Amino acid sequence: MAVIVPVITVDGPSGAGKGTLCQALAKAFGWHLLDSGAIYRVLALAALHHHVDITSEDALVPLAANLDVRFIPNENGLSVILEGEDVSTEIRTETVGNTASQAATFPRVREALLRRQRAFRTAPGLIADGRDMGTIVFPDAQVKIFLDASAQERARRRMLQLQEKGFNVNFERLLSEIKERDYRDRNRAVAPLVAAKDALILDSTSLSIDEVIEKSLAYAKKICN
């Protein structure tokens, strides 16, 4: 009888704190970690590198099907490797993020990357970070968490992150981009951003990251144990 590899999914909008939570869960359980959003960002960056038309689904599908991407754990979470090059920092720019969100609206692009994401499900278990992990990619996941926060709070967090890295950012522009991305993600025809019916919904707007981790760990351990 085939052994079912356990999965914990963490979905939610950009900037809600999913990445930090998933890294904490992966460390606590000793499981693999999949940053599905990074896959779309890597695809977007690959399209920019290879001058592929990001508005053309036909052009993006073969690139997605043959995407050379690896995730290597490190002290800070994950190193994202594209075609042998560490692009962990490059894929986190707002330009790449917005391009990735556009690419994610294409059904055949999502299908090409769906198979790749499911291949990350290996023993002893997987923590999956994304927007449709609990609804589309791993609907049979044992634990599903939907992490949310207000657009204003997410813009504030993102601004601080970028400033710490030396980027000069405008809060209002950042807030506008987050709202636009939210609208695209929540209203796209294929796999819109929505909480799974059996997910624990956590609003992190007024919570510290430690409180989010504590609540999520308690919930996950109760189910997984």
UniProtKB/Swiss-Prot annotation:
It is found in: Cytoplasm. It is an enzyme of class 2 (transferase). This is Cytidylate kinase. It comes from Proteus mirabilis (strain HI4320). The gene is cmk. Keywords: ATP-binding, Cytoplasm, Kinase, Nucleotide-binding, Transferase. The lineage of its organism: Bacteria, Pseudomonadati, Pseudomonadota, Gammaproteobacteria, Enterobacterales. One of its GO terms (molecular function) is ATP binding. ATP binds at G12, P13, S14, G15, A16, G17, K18, G19, T20. Belongs to the cytidylate kinase family. Type 1 subfamily.
